[in-house]
Amino acid sequence: MTQPWILGLTGGIGSGKSAAAEHFISLGVHLVDADHAARWVVEPGRPALAKIVERFGDGILLPDGQLDRAALRERIFQAPEERRWLEQLLHPLIGAEIVQYLARAESPYAILVSPLLVESGQRQMTHRVLVVDTPEHLQLQRTMLRDKVSEEQVRSILQAQARRDERLKHADDVLVNDGDLSHLQREVERLHAFYLTLRGGRA
């Protein structure tokens, strides 16, 4: 069997990237979520967690031994050098985890979904990039509704993510998600049919 090629799927908060990912899964495409990989590498018993505790102390653990993400975020928020240390520890481990899960794919192509595909350098692991793009007013509206957060909070998250034009610059394909769910699903099906004709992510 030929090795599946890898599609990078990304989009800003509230763009509909998760809904698109779910529909690709329903069509039988193997998908790896970078956010999940980031959680797996710091599970109890994994070497990364021991190193984090060694550096920051037991205060960043929950009573059940899991990583207290909020406490860790607080520790690194005002300390760029600590954040860099953490990134240097975790990024290679997350990358290795992603590669391992992508290797299990049995579909003609596999998807790596990541909100930080462009910023983290994870797009180097892909053959093609699909950006789910949404007008900013819809991103704000959807995220405020879904996460019950203020417009200010959503705007601060948007600022931390790659700028829309930066993401689009790296896109091979763009799915404009400015309609309802059935519109999004039709677009995913259209792209899926096209992707099945590709070899190595190229026509």
Curated annotation (Swiss-Prot):
**EC number(s) per UniProt?**
2.7.1.24
Task of the protein = Catalyzes the phosphorylation of the 3'-hydroxyl group of dephosphocoenzyme A to form coenzyme A.
Chief subcellular site?
cytoplasm
Q: Which family does it belong to?
A: Belongs to the CoaE family.
Q: Which UniProt keywords apply?
A: ATP-binding, Coenzyme A biosynthesis, Cytoplasm, Kinase, Nucleotide-binding, Transferase
Point out the gene that encodes the protein: coaE
Q: Which PROSITE patterns does the entry mention?
A: DPCK
Q: Where in the cell is it found?
A: Cytoplasm
Query: Reaction catalysed?
Result: 3'-dephospho-CoA + ATP = ADP + CoA + H(+)
User: What is the recorded name of this protein?
Assistant: Dephospho-CoA kinase
